[in-house]
Design a protein with these regions (language model features):
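A conserved active-site cap/scaffold subdomain adjacent to cofactor or substrate pockets
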Residues: 241-287, 291-310
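Structural motif
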Residues: 1-2, 29-32, 71, 113, ...
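Glycine-rich beta-alpha junction loops
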Residues: 37-38, 220-222, 271, 275-280, ...
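Nucleotide/pyrophosphate-binding catalytic subdomain
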Residues: 1-256, 261, 420
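A conserved regulatory-domain signal marking ACT and ACT-like small-molecule sensing domains
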Residues: 282-439
Length: 439
């Protein structure tokens, strides 16, 4: 059995939903994970913001506009009056439910319930369309089997057990439709897997059913070897190792959510990135296979802050780095890059929520300097240290660009450069020319 996930743009209109239906109805049994229609989650966040500010009138105005859009989608999606009516009833039910939260105290709990409505609506609409077309499909409520534990991490044992129970109720179905993103927490409350969580849902489901393949369908032709919005002549990458894909996803390749990789990797289930706008394109296959000695892609991560701590007390001392790291840990701030010398250490962070407190604590140990508006450029591939030559190529491409930090050796798949954000475009283009375009 395969697991297919379609993002918001892939189900962003009635026509797109019809195209998705064509893609999934090939006679093979499969589980299909759907996001909310594009723009819906952002609008639900906007509604929530109004309710936090105790402005139910503003919230209701947006609710009415969104409901009108959905009524139009229903009219365009279904051919028969019977299913138009079914669609309208679903729309009314969910929007009445959203409106019920405009009358009382609004908290984070209520916001998560409101945000869940987008996926619940899109899956109901697609399931009805498949049934109207005569396809044997059924809706599997994600809230019946997707759960996180007390640490807000997915509970794979629970997911596998409860999902199997749901599947056994409908053994003869061709298509099982379910929601991405949404789940219940350890206390049974409606929750979610955060933004991009639909990828995570698909990967968790794939691992739970031991899928033959997980397919992530978006509006892009697989993972590219550089950012096509910035760089000329990028090309799709046809094959990636799981660790290469994880590096690229973390460092800015938005086609895939970083957390999606792990369940599939550990279950050894290949993940294929495909394009709903060009379904015949080969896309990108992610697996545990490695192409030896090959550089695959370049990615960039913005909004990076670099912090340098210089201290003579670090010279020949033990325990200094532990004290530094404990400061970042106490403020729940992750470090992206790190470089050390005999008398100093430089680190980068992308979460500056507690920057001032961190700097105050670090000043106890030495002189602290900060560089903001920085960017991490990440070169990804099979970069085992025995493979010679790739460092020289990457450094040669960066020869005219001021580099604040270089990180290599922590991973066999990544060499990272810290530069100013204003130099990002020229750095990405130069790396593409040197590594992929043979200039």
């Amino acid at each position: 059995m395969k697991v297919l996930k379609f993002g918001g743009t892939s189900v962003g209109s009635a026509q797109r939903m019809k195209e998705v239906a064509k893609l999934i109805t090939d006679g093979e049994q499969k589980i299909v994970v759907l996001s909310a229609m594009s723009g819906t989650t952002n609008t639900l966040v906007e509604i929530s913001d109004y309710l936090y500010k105790k402005n139910p009138e503003g919230a209701n105005e947006i609710i009415n506009k969104l409901e009108s859009k959905y009524k139009q989608h229903v009219d365009e999606l279904y051919a028969t009056q019977e299913y138009k009516q079914k669609g309208l009833e679903v729309i009314k039910s969910h929007f009445d439910y959203i409106r019920s939260y405009t009358k009382d105290l609004f908290t984070l709990f209520e916001e998560k319930v409101v945000l869940a409505q987008g996926e619940l609506i899109s899956t109901a609409m697609v399931n009805f369309y498949l049934q109207e077309c005569g396809v044997k499909s059924v809706l599997l409520p994600a809230l019946e089997f997707m759960r996180t534990d007390k640490n807000a991490e997915p509970d794979p044992v629970y997911i596998k057990e409860k999902l199997q129970t749901q599947l056994e109720l409908y053994p003869d179905m061709e298509i099982y439709i379910t929601q991405g993103f949404i789940c219940r927490n350890a206390y049974g409350e409606i929750d979610n897997l955060q933004r991009g969580g639909s990828d995570y849902t698909a990967s968790l489901i794939g691992a739970a059913v031991n899928a033959s393949e997980i397919q992530i369908w978006t509006d892009i032709d697989g993972m590219h070897n550089n950012d096509p919005r910035i760089v000329d002549k990028t090309a799709p990458v046809r094959q990636l190792h799981f660790d290469e894909a994880a590096e690229l996803a973390y460092f800015g390749a938005n086609i895939l959510h970083p957390t999606c990789i792990q369940p599939a990797k550990y279950a050894n289930i290949p993940v294929r990135l495909l394009n709903t706008m060009d379904p015949d394109a080969p896309g990108t296959l992610i697996s545990n296979d490695t192409e030896k000695g090959k550089i695959k892609a370049v990615a960039a991560k913005n909004n990076i802050t670099a912090i340098k701590i210089k201290s003579s007390r670090m010279l020949l001392a033990h325990g200094f780095l532990r004290k530094v790291f404990e400061i970042f840990e106490s403020y729940q701030t992750s470090i992206d890059m790190i470089c050390t010398s005999e008398v100093g250490v430089s680190v980068t962070i992308d979460n500056t929520k507690h920057l001032n407190e961190i700097l105050d604590d670090l000043k106890k140990y030495g002189t602290v300097t900060v560089d903001k508006d920085m960017c991490i450029i990440c070169v990804v591939g099979d970069l085992e240290w025995e493979n010679v030559g790739f460092e020289a190529k990457a450094l040669d491409a960066m020869r005219d660009i001021p580099v604040r930090m270089i990180s290599f050796g922590g991973s066999n798949y990544n060499i990272s450069f810290l530069i100013r954000e204003c130099d990002k475009k020229i750095a990405l283009q130069s790396l593409s020319d040197m590594l992929f375009n043979n200039k």
